[in-house]
Amino acid sequence: MDRRKKGSKHHLATDAAGTPLAAEVTAANVNDVTRLIPLVDAIPPVRGKPGAPRHKPGEVMGDRAYHDEQRRTVLRGRGIAPVLARRGDPHGSGFGILRHVVEQTIALLHQLRRLRNRFDKRDDIHQTFLTIGCAVICWRRLHRLTG
C-alpha cells in the first residue's frame, strides 16, 4: 500500500451490458483486492426471469488487481464462478474484450464533472454523487430503450 497516494478510486460492478449494479469509493491507496467481496455483497437482487430474484451473480469478472486465491475461494463457496485474470500471466488473455464494458461505464461516469474531478472532502458526499451518477446512466439507458 502506498500511503502517500492522494485521491480516490471508483470500484464498479456492472452487468454484461454495462449497467451499473454497485459502486463504491475508496481512497487511492487501498488495494483493489480488498474491495472485491464487499462490492459483490453490494449488488442488489435483480429480477429477470419469472420467479424469485437473483441474489448473487453467476460469475464475477475482474482484472489482475482483483486476483487473490483467498477471494476466489470465498466466491466459489458462495456459488459464484470467479473469472479473474491471474497476476504474472502474460497479457493477451482476452479480458480486454470483456473489460471494455466496465471501462465504458466508468467513462460515462467521468463525463459528470463532480465525479471526474473530486471537489468533495467527505467520502460520503462523493459516494452519494457516484450513486446519483449510476442512476443517471440507468435512466439514460432506460429512456433510450423506451423513448
Go through the PLM ranges and name each one:
Residues E69-T73, G77-G79, G92-G147:
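Basic, amphipathic alpha-helical segments enriched in Lys/Arg and hydrophobic/aromatic residues
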Residues M1-R87, G133, R140:
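Polybasic low-complexity intrinsically disordered regions
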